[in-house]
A protein has these predicted regions:
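Substrate-binding clefts and substrate-entry loops adjacent to catalytic sites
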Residues: 60-74, 109-116, 124-166, 191-203, ...
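Solvent-exposed, polar/charged alpha-helical surfaces in well-ordered, non-transmembrane soluble domains
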Residues: 77, 81-84, 88, 100, ...
C-alpha cells in the first residue's frame, strides 16, 4: 500500500512537470495549487487524472482557452443571477459542480438560446425530452427557458445517464450525442476510457462530442484559475456568492407590465427574471409562478394586491412569417399588418430596432371578418355555378 502511494505521488509529479514544461513553451502559468484544482475537477467527473497529460487535450488547450474564455466571462458577468442558482441546485442534488460548464457550453447560459435543431434554453432541451422530464411547453409558457426548473430537469436527466453508464464523464458525453451512440462507441472501442473514446484518429465519437467534453473541462479549468479571473476582473473571483431572486405566486391572465409596475420594476428587468413567459401576460387558468428579486419579497408580501390587477385578453393571435426586405423597419411592418412594434418585438424576442435583410419575423395577424365573409360568399357562388 505504501509503495502504491509513493508510486502515485511520483506519477503525479511527472505529470505536473510535463504540464509545466508545456505551459512554459506556450507562455501559460501553472501553480501547484491550480494543478491540484485541475486534478480535483477530473476526479469529480470520474476522469483518470492522467488525462491531463493527454497530448491531444494538452495541444487543444491554448486554442480552446482563447476561444472560450469570453463565454466564461460573459456567463459570469451577464448572468450573475443564474450561475449561483445553478451551483446551489447542483450542490443540493449532490452532483459535480462542473456540470455548470456543460450549460455554458450548450447555451452560454442564455435562456432564449435556440439551436439549429430547435433545442431551447440554458440546457438546450428538445421538446420531447423536456416534456418527458416534466417541463411545461404550450402556447403560454416554455419552461425550458426557466433556468431553475430546467436545471432540476437537467440534473435528473444527467443522474439517469450516470446511473446507466456509471461515470459522470460518460453522462456528459451521452447528454451531447445520445445514449445509443455512446453505447455503440464504447462497444467499438472496447473501452469506456475517455482518452480512448475521444481519440482523434479512431473517431469513435463525432468531432462535436469530442470537442464537447474538452470545452467543458477547459471552462472548468479557467473558472478555477484565480490568476486568469483576477487578470480579467477581480470581482469574478467571488462570482458564485450572489443569488438574489425568489419564486412567488403569479396571478393568471395579468399583463406582465402591470406586474412589473406593481413591484416597482421596469418591464425589461421583470422579463429577465421570467424568460419562460412567451407573451406579455401570465397564463390563463389556475395560478402560475414568477420570479422576483430577493429584495422585493417583503414588499411583495406586504403590498401586492391581486384584485387591483386587471385581467387581460389571453387569446393567442394568429401569426405569419415575414421576411425582411430592403427599406423595411419595425414601424413600417407593424403599420402594414395593423399591429404594434411592441408586439413584434415581444413575439420575436428582439430588443433593438435594427433588422437584417432576409431576417424572418413572426407577425401577429388580426382576423379580418369582412375578408372572411367575402371568401365564404365567393365559395358559395362557386358552388352554385358548379352545380
Amino acid at each position: 500500500m505504501l509503495t502504491d502511494y509513493f508510486l502515485k505521488v511520483k506519477y503525479e509529479k511527472i505529470i505536473f512537470c510535463f504540464i509545466l514544461f508545456y505551459n512554459f513553451l506556450f507562455a501559460q502559468t501553472t501553480t501547484p495549487e491550480f494543478y491540484e484544482r485541475q486534478m480535483s475537477i477530473l476526479r469529480n467527473l470520474d476522469i483518470d487524472p492522467s488525462f491531463i497529460s493527454d497530448l491531444a487535450f494538452v495541444q487543444s488547450q491554448q486554442d480552446l482557452r482563447s476561444k472560450h474564455a469570453p463565454t466564461l466571462i460573459d456567463g459570469i458577468q451577464n448572468f450573475s443571477k443564474v450561475t449561483p442558482m445553478i451551483r446551489k441546485i447542483l450542490a443540493q442534488q449532490e452532483v459535480p459542480e462542473e456540470i455548470l460548464y456543460l450549460a455554458m457550453v450548450e447555451s452560454g447560459l442564455k435562456a432564449h438560446s435556440v439551436s439549429n435543431a430547435k433545442a431551447v434554453g440554458v440546457w438546450q432541451f428538445m421538446q420531447p425530452t423536456a416534456r418527458n422530464l416534466g417541463l411545461r411547453i404550450d402556447a403560454y409558457v416554455d419552461e425550458r427557458r426557466d433556468p431553475v426548473k430546467s436545471t432540476y430537469a437537467a440534473v435528473h436527466y444527467l443522474k439517469s445517464l450516470k446511473e446507466e453508464f456509471g461515470k459522470w464523464y460518460l453522462a456528459l458525453l451521452a447528454y451531447n450525442c445520445g445514449n445509443g451512440k455512446l453505447r455503440q462507441a464504447i462497444k467499438q472501442a472496447g473501452s469506456d476510457d475517455l482518452r480512448v473514446l475521444i481519440d482523434p484518429d479512431k473517431k469513435y465519437l463525432s468531432l462535436e462530442t469530442r470537442n464537447f467534453i474538452r470545452k467543458i473541462l477547459t471552462l472548468a479549468f479557467l473558472a478555477n484559475d484565480r490568476d486568469f479571473l483576477l487578470d480579467k476582473d477581480g470581482a469574478l473571483v467571488n462570482y458564485a456568492l450572489n443569488n438574489d431572486f425568489a419564486k412567488v405566486d403569479a396571478p393568471s391572465s395579468v399583463a406582465l407590465k402591470d406586474l412589473a409596475k406593481n413591484l416597482n420594476m421596469d418591464l425589461a428587468t421583470f422579463k429577465k427574471y421570467n424568460p419562460h413567459f412567451k407573451h406579455g401576460f401570465t397564463p390563463p387558468g389556475k395560478g402560475y409562478y414568477m420570479y422576483i428579486p430577493l429584495n422585493k419579497v417583503a414588499f411583495f408580501d406586504k403590498n401586492f394586491k391581486v384584485e387591483k390587477l386587471a385581467k387581460v385578453d389571453t387569446t393567442i393571435p394568429m401569426t405569419k412569417i415575414y421576411i425582411v426586405k430592403s427599406g423595411d423597419s419595425l414601424y413600417k411592418i407593424a403599420k402594414k399588418y395593423n399591429t404594434s412594434v411592441e408586439q413584434i418585438r415581444e413575439l420575436n424576442k428582439i430588443a433593438k430596432n435594427h433588422l437584417s435583410i432576409n431576417q424572418k419575423l413572426i407577425i401577429p395577424i388580426k382576423e379580418n371578418k369582412n375578408a372572411n365573409y367575402k371568401t365564404k360568399a365567393k365559395e358559395n357562388f362557386t358552388q352554385v355555378v358548379s352545380r
